Amino acid sequence: MRLVYLESPYAGDTHEEIAENVRYARACMADCLRRGEAPFASHLLYTQPGVLRDEVKEERKLGMSAGFKWSRMAPVSVFYVDRGFSDGMIQGMEVAQAHGRYVEMRKLKGWK
């Protein structure tokens, strides 16, 4: 199993948009697992209740910094882009490129 760092949108303007982004990220994680990969999606882990609040700027920055540190453990960053390319994903791309990590763009079949 190869390690992959999973990038997909998280933040949203409404609770519904965030919930849809979480649903999408979970589907992306399942896609990685079906491909025989071991994905890590820090935006799903660090935003759980009682951990960090994404809507609080300092906490979002802390979570992103921790996630980007973990991303160095994987030789590949996979970006799922059916729901767009968020500001956080842009930063993730910059970090991946700065560390010479391979970047792969993906879409989920049948995702609307």
Language-model segments: residues:
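Catalytic phosphate/metal-binding cores of nucleic-acid and nucleotide-processing enzymes, i.e., regions
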Residues: 1-112
